[in-house]
Amino acid sequence: MEYIAYGPPDLEANVTALNTTETQVLRCNTLDSVCFTSVLGKRVPNYLLSTCSQRALLLSPKLPKYTYIFGASAWWVHTGENPPQRLQVCANLVRSSWRSVDMVRRQLPASQYAQIAGVPCICLEHAALEMALHAGRVQGREIILTACRHGANRSGLLTAFNYLRGRSRNGWLEQLINELLPAVISTRTLGTGSAAGRIDTVNLAHDR
């Protein structure tokens, strides 16, 4: 009778990750895989993960002070690939431990970081090389190409390589960058016969 008298309760669109109780209502495994993505162990509606800014803001409440989103977590923020189940962060100066995150310590320049919707995150190029380094040569090729489709370029990748930990033991990664994104001599320079050729770089970027 109360329902008839007052009508249904006001409904509001969900704009946050769903809690366990909410995700158990009207469950359908097939729809779950289409409508939700598991991030840090929680089901999140896909429409909240469409952009870099949305993904960065989703992780920001879990980000410890004075740290940056790093590694696979940063890769997901930039590309939307491989949602993290545990947050990986980087600390420049502080040395501390957090049970809820995987923390690494790096001394990196400001050029290797980006602010995404106000959330500090390692840059796309550095995230790509960290992923490629752990994935190996075969998968590393696809990772670099994916990074380029999301805005990375040869110059940025080579700069990031200079700050990559273990680069001296992983020269194959630099070779892979040069193989996939070779420097191209400008045709205008070739036409002038100039000995000091201007170098352009291949850029597969697209607007995000």
Predicted stretch roles:
Residues 1-208:
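Short gly/ser-rich loop at a beta-strand->alpha-helix junction or flexible surface loop bordering the NTP-binding
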